[in-house]
Structures are given as C-alpha cells and as structure tokens.
C-alpha cells in the first residue's frame, strides 16, 4: 500500500462563478435560466459569464447616468423620471431602448425652433 487515495486533501471553500469572474450579477442563475428557457439544446460554460458581464455593464451605465440626473435635480433617490432622462439623453442607450416605455418617466423637454418667438432686432438710429 502506497498510502494514496485516503484523505489528505482538504476541500477548498466553494467559490461562486460570479466571484471568479469578478461580477456582481449571478452567473449560476443566468446559466440556469438559459438552460430552462429553450434558447438552445446546450449552453456553453462561458455564455452565462459573458451575458452576466454585459448585463452588469449596462445596469452600471444606466445607474451612473440616472444618478447624475438625480443629482442635477437635487435629489438623492433615483426615480423613473431620472431613468428616462438618462436614457433619452444618451444617444447609444436611446437607440438600444428606443422601443421601451418607462412608466412614470415623462417626456424630454423639447420645443421646435420654429415655434419659438422671433427675435426682434433693435433698430439703431
């Protein structure tokens, strides 16, 4: 007997796939949802990590801009109006979410130039 195979190795503490990837979004849950959602017969190991990273980036981007909008309005809490202002004022996010309606979001303040009063020139004698 060489003594191999019996004990010896201590099992390492479980580390989530989210923490391995350095993400906050749940990689395991996204993997489960991809499998259960009939998106394909099989789901690769990298797919949920990539998707979680993309979702986390988009969420961080929207929250950053919405936080700025809230601060501009002297508020400490982000409301749907701030989300609407953040998304519609950003060209790329507006294109991505063009078909999305945000409840209680309101509209962007916009007045067509032709509707503004004409500027009268002061006549000099």
Curated annotation (Swiss-Prot):
Q: Where is the composition biased (Basic residues)?
A: 1-18
- Cross-linked residues, Glycyl lysine isopeptide (Lys-Gly) (interchain with G-Cter in ubiquitin): 119
Q: Which PANTHER family match?
A: HISTONE H2A
Subcellular location(s) per record: Nucleus; Chromosome
One CC-aspect GO term: nucleosome
Give GO MF terms, alphabetically: DNA binding; protein heterodimerization activity; structural constituent of chromatin
Presence of keyword Nucleus: yes
N-terminal signal peptide: none
Against InterPro entries, the record matches this protein to: Histone-fold, Histone_H2A, Histone_H2A/H2B/H3, Histone_H2A_C, Histone_H2A_CS
Tell me the segments the record calls region Disordered: 1-21
What role does this protein play?
Core component of nucleosome. Nucleosomes wrap and compact DNA into chromatin, limiting DNA accessibility to the cellular machineries which require DNA as a template. Histones thereby play a central role in transcription regulation, DNA repair, DNA replication and chromosomal stability. DNA accessibility is regulated via a complex set of post-translational modifications of histones, also called histone code, and nucleosome remodeling.
Please state what the protein is called: Histone H2A
Q: How does it assemble?
A: The nucleosome is a histone octamer containing two molecules each of H2A, H2B, H3 and H4 assembled in one H3-H4 heterotetramer and two H2A-H2B heterodimers. The octamer wraps approximately 147 bp of DNA.
Q: Please give the residue positions where the record annotates the modification Phosphoserine.
A: 2
Q: Which UniProt keywords apply?
A: Acetylation, Chromosome, DNA-binding, Isopeptide bond, Nucleosome core, Nucleus, Phosphoprotein, Ubl conjugation
| Keyword Ubl conjugation applies | yes
Post-translational modification here is noted as:
Monoubiquitination of Lys-119 gives a specific tag for epigenetic transcriptional repression.
Family recorded in the similarity comment = Belongs to the histone H2A family.
Q: At which residues is N-acetylserine found?
A: 2
């Amino acid at each position: 007997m060489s003594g191999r195979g019996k004990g010896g190795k201590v099992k390492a503490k479980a580390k989530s796939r989210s923490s391995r990837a350095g993400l906050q979004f749940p990689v395991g849950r996204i993997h489960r949802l991809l499998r259960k959602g009939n998106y394909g017969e099989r789901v690769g190991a990298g797919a949920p990590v990539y998707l979680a990273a993309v979702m986390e980036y988009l969420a961080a981007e929207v929250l950053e801009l919405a936080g700025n909008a809230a601060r501009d309005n002297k508020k400490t809490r982000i409301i749907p109006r701030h989300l609407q202002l953040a998304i519609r004022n950003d060209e790329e996010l507006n294109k991505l979410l063009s078909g999305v309606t945000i409840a209680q979001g309101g509209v962007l303040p916009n007045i067509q130039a032709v509707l503004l009063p004409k500027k009268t020139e002061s006549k000099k004698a």
